[in-house]
Amino acid sequence: MKRIFESREAVFAGFLVATLGVGCVTPGGGGTELFNGKNLDGWEVTDFAGGGAIKVKDGEIHIAMGELISGINLAHENIPRTNYELEAEAMKLDGNDFFCGLTFPVGDTFASFIPGGWGGTVVGISSIDGMDAAENETATFKQFKTHQWYHFRVRVTPGKIQCWVDDEMVVDLLLEDRAIALRAGPIELSVPIGITSFQTVTRIRNIRLQPIKP
């Protein structure tokens, strides 16, 4: 079974290379690298009004503080909709709100994992049954330090959304009979996969996508 699964990973990596181009997709031991560390090939700067400047330097994506939301989104939609993990590492340098919002597919819809929103401490999923991360049962509270790298991971299966901050599981949401959607507004531009910050100075690195066993 392990050999079959590894073969599926190789096929998946090859598929992404074929559709997105070798500039942004590099097979790696921890999944498929969506960011090549050199430029934003395969990505686009999301057209948020008043978004902060974005550049690549020293193998990281540097996002300056914007008026409100800033970020990037994958420039292609040929990605898995379920049975995958998405992960990224992020560091907040300044600001008091979320610094690595991850927008991702959930079947035929999308959701966002928000670490450190609503003043810097709320962690959760937006939106569930029309309620934001601060309002629904995924809401937890966590202090995020500046100048410290955090590892964020999202796992999507047909039955669940699970999220981790470093090694701590912070979301374990059953999807049956739940209405999953993006919060209405600018975040709807952050598809099919997006990374966003809200009035923060942010560094992003090691963006990976990996299929998992059904």
Question: Could you describe each region identified by the protein language model?
Answer:
Residues F12-G23:
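Bacterial N-terminal signal peptides
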Residues C24-P214:
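Carbohydrate-interacting regions of secretory-pathway proteins
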Residues K2-F12:
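Bacterial N-terminal signal peptides that target proteins for export
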